């Protein structure tokens, strides 16, 4: 792949990521962006109002901000591990091609 095609591909990917982040904020006005846990809790309370959960979390974050911090840290760690694995396998495949 020549340099101009790769550069165009990179810019298209960056544009796609930006569009995925911005378009929902523009087109879905006044929407509640809640997590799946909150949505599930709401659905369960509508179906069975007196339901009591049978499991308690091992750790309850003291605030929503701490919960968001833990969630984003977990996402960053996962992305780092996936990025490392992709880079490792790409490097191995390039090394194999250069040996041949």
From Swiss-Prot:
The chain crosses the membrane at residues 8-28, 69-89. One of its GO terms (molecular function) is cobalt ion transmembrane transporter activity. GO terms for cellular component: plasma membrane. It is a multi-pass membrane protein. InterPro entries: CbiN (IPR003705). One of its GO terms (biological process) is cobalamin biosynthetic process. Pfam families: CbiN. Pathway: Cofactor biosynthesis; adenosylcobalamin biosynthesis. It is found in: Cell inner membrane. Keywords: Cell inner membrane, Cell membrane, Cobalamin biosynthesis, Cobalt, Cobalt transport, Ion transport, Membrane, Transmembrane, Transmembrane helix, Transport. The keyword Glycoprotein does not apply. HAMAP family: CbiN. Belongs to the CbiN family. Part of the energy-coupling factor (ECF) transporter complex CbiMNOQ involved in cobalt import. Forms an energy-coupling factor (ECF) transporter complex composed of an ATP-binding protein (A component, CbiO), a transmembrane protein (T component, CbiQ) and 2 possible substrate-capture proteins (S components, CbiM and CbiN) of unknown stoichimetry. This is Cobalt transport protein CbiN. It comes from Nostoc sp. (strain PCC 7120 / SAG 25.82 / UTEX 2576).
């Amino acid at each position: 792949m020549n340099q101009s095609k790769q550069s165009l591909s990179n810019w298209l990917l960056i544009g796609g990521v930006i569009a995925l982040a911005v378009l929902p904020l523009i087109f879905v006005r006044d929407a509640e962006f809640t997590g799946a846990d909150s949505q599930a809790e709401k659905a369960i309370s509508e179906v069975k109002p007196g339901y009591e959960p049978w499991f308690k979390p091992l750790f309850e974050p003291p605030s929503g901000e701490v919960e968001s911090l833990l969630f984003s840290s977990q996402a960053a760690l996962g992305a780092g591990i996936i990025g490392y694995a992709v880079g490792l396998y790409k490097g191995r495949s390039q090394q194999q091609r250069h040996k041949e």
